[in-house]
Amino acid sequence: MIILDEPYVSPELAAYAAARQEPVLDNATARACARDYGAALNLTPEDAFASLCREDAPRLYTCSENALDWVYAHSGNNALVERVRRLKDKAVCRERLAPLYADFFFRQVTLEELAALPFEALKVPCVLKPAVGFFSLGVHRIENAAQWEAAKVAVARDAALWREQYPPEVVGGGRFLLEEYIQGEEYAVDVYYDRQGRAVVCNILRHEFSSDADVSDRLYYTSREIIESRLNEFEAWFNRVNGPLGLRNFPVHVELRRDAGGRIAPIEFNPLRFAGWCSTDVSLFAWGFHSYGCFLEDTRPDWERVLAGKEGLLYTLMVLNKPENCPPVRDFDYDALCRDFGKVLHLRPCDFRRFSHFGFLFTETPADRREELDRIIRSDLTEYIQQE
């Protein structure tokens, strides 16, 4: 079963759903996809779809957390709703996992408490983020008093904008989480739990930053070397944390960090979906399979086969986020952007007047010739912006 919802449905997902005739909730977004993509979707009326959701551990995939509102209100499956809530609310998730991370500092505060909280009360370095959040919105790393005051101003300013762009089930501007900064390399993992609660990893992306202060989603990449070195270790960790989480037939997009000593700590679990917008399609462009297809068909990637001949290559996903204090934009030069990369696999422009980014770019880049990645991760993209 699939729920398609705003802000974006990739044509690959729509084509997959049509080819498989997966039950798709009949909503405005799904009807628009059927019309715009010419996809013969198996549109299923709400009552019938809700009946399928009430099965024990239904196999449900959403492309957007905007769909969570429907799950809460109409699925009629209290166990499913509880599992979603325990992941989506980062404070609740931290409390669930606390027995596994007894020395990990976190604290939940309201917007009003945040405004009055002095820097001296913090354990730094730390991270401030919405307790219910998405897409690195409202995430701030804090090391000093100036950063703390700037973060509080930014959060107060942006909370109203989040309410306009996302429902409260996706981004909440009323409660925030303060937690210790997790050291190590950051990864984004698309993983699902099968009917027995066993983890199946469908892709692993390294999340790279331009500096310690950077919290953006600009650059992710996967490779044969990343999969081979992290797959077994990460699956074992996912199986361990599922003890307190209790997930079955459940897809999750997980952000985590692994330090030099091999200690893995979660950043967040994003329920009922894989990487947001069209990001999970990197598995198709890199490895030739749909990540969501593995979940919906209850299959495990044949890594030995798909990794053959892929040595020395990085398969990237770049989020073309707007710079801070972005001037009014008349146009964005996507052609010039693509010319700056040796092999573009796919470009996904977005409505930059509506959203906080210009689109998504997927490339194949030799690991020993990654200058194009080092450049783009530090770029504010103004060289491609045509101002009004």
Residue ranges and their predicted role:
Residues 29-122, 134, 365-380:
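Conserved N-proximal alpha/beta basic substrate-recognition cap immediately N-terminal to
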Residues 126-156, 186-190, 210-226:
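Glycine-rich phosphate-binding loop of ATP-grasp-fold ATP-dependent ligases
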Residues 2-18:
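N-terminal basic/disordered segments at the start of proteins
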Residues 242-278, 307-314, 318-326:
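Conserved metal-phosphate-binding beta-hairpin within the catalytic cores
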Residues 103-104, 145-183, 244, 376, ...:
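Conserved ATP-binding module of the ATP-grasp superfamily
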Residues 97, 122-142, 161-184, 189:
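ATP-grasp fold ATP-binding core
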Residues 296-388:
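Peripheral (often C-terminal) accessory segments that flank ATP-dependent C-N-forming ligase machineries
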Residues 180-183, 190-246, 270-299:
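ATP-dependent carboxylate/phosphate-activation module, predominantly the ATP-grasp catalytic core
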